[in-house]
């Protein structure tokens, strides 16, 4: 059904629907609800909770982050940091000027201890030497940002090519050379977690430097990241968010009539899985890219323009999971913050097919030591890619047994007490997420993220701004982050404000 070319009279203001109650959706809703031009706004959330990929759970006697973990770049230019500060969710250290001025370059700090698969500890001096090499090469990738062409398509291939040249100049014995390569391989696995990808060979080289790192030493929320989205929820009028309301299809570019609104026509009608329909003048879609890709053929009617659909298929979207292990007593030192795992028979210069069944755990980068809860000690492991997705298919008992064996092996202590319990994220299996976050894949560019962010209809035919797009995968320089997601929600809210705000008394948008 063709759109009438106008949103009609819209008595009392436009009807706006936000699909998805993550930080992008809540950010858009909060921005619009604060304005008198938008009295009719609903957020449709598929699950029973708000927050999306921000998910804090009470466990082990404290709070753990099943989803987003850190504020990346907590400084004045970061809206998540600013909002958290306004809500009083951060401590004195996190708010300190000193913390905000730290330049990390986006790189993870050095491990406190590095365990090798033979049961020996790796020299931290050797680890630091390899970290300097690896992150120096990562920084070098920025040279290709505006280059007409790149020597190889991917970040992984570039790193391996450069490392190969360095290896040729190494003068140590064979055993030390192999250990250096194994340590480098663990940094590759870590970078896969950072980028949310199975392999750095999948990450495009040219646009890699477009991702922008903000100053500030990454920090956490002592009482849980979800405290932020809870505060945002509390700022919305009651019943704005409708829970357990998954959307099936967004029908757009039409002239839809609803019995509840006699005499009105709407360019969009949102059909939910339970059969309910919501008419709207504007819909802000904030669902994760993984979900969008899986349901691309049925989520929009008519289908998305070919160019936008192609961008959705090309942008990368992978899995990074966490495995929490609870211990009665710590086997690590009191000042330990990060435990690195190094598999001595691995090398980034050797392409090995993933052995999911027997060796999925070798992709695990190690463990972050969480702040001790009341007499409880917890490690948080990170694992990305196909191995991470395979881990989701295992039982808790299988994961616990496997990682107990790994820890006994690398510490050289066959009597190391097994963890008391395990908790895992399963972002790939989550039906409304289907992964963790986006990256710019080989074959795509930052332009694809901009293309995904463009509202529909794109040609100006029909009512304006029927479908708008937000979420971390729509932010060209802050993709994969909560601050990118929040900014994208604000961006789309501002599009509607610029259309409607001057029309508060005469609610008809400029056409």
Curated annotation (Swiss-Prot):
Its cofactor is FAD. A motif (Microbody targeting signal) lies at residues 509-511. It comes from the Eukaryota. Binds 1 FAD per subunit. It is found in: Peroxisome; Cytoplasm. It catalyses: N(1)-acetylspermine + O2 + H2O = 3-acetamidopropanal + spermidine + H2O2; N(1)-acetylspermidine + O2 + H2O = 3-acetamidopropanal + putrescine + H2O2; N(1),N(12)-diacetylspermine + O2 + H2O = 3-acetamidopropanal + N(1)-acetylspermidine + H2O2. GO terms for molecular function: N(1)-acetylpolyamine oxidase (3-acetamidopropanal-forming) activity; polyamine oxidase activity. Widely expressed. Not detected in spleen. Expressed at lower level in neoplastic tissues. Its EC number is 1.5.3.13. Pathway: Amine and polyamine metabolism; spermine metabolism. Flavoenzyme which catalyzes the oxidation of N(1)-acetylspermine to spermidine and is thus involved in the polyamine back-conversion. Can also oxidize N(1)-acetylspermidine to putrescine. Substrate specificity: N(1)-acetylspermine = N(1)-acetylspermidine > N(1),N(12)-diacylspermine >> spermine. Does not oxidize spermidine. Plays an important role in the regulation of polyamine intracellular concentration and has the potential to act as a determinant of cellular sensitivity to the antitumor polyamine analogs. Belongs to the flavin monoamine oxidase family. This is Peroxisomal N(1)-acetyl-spermine/spermidine oxidase. It comes from Homo sapiens (Human). The gene is PAOX.
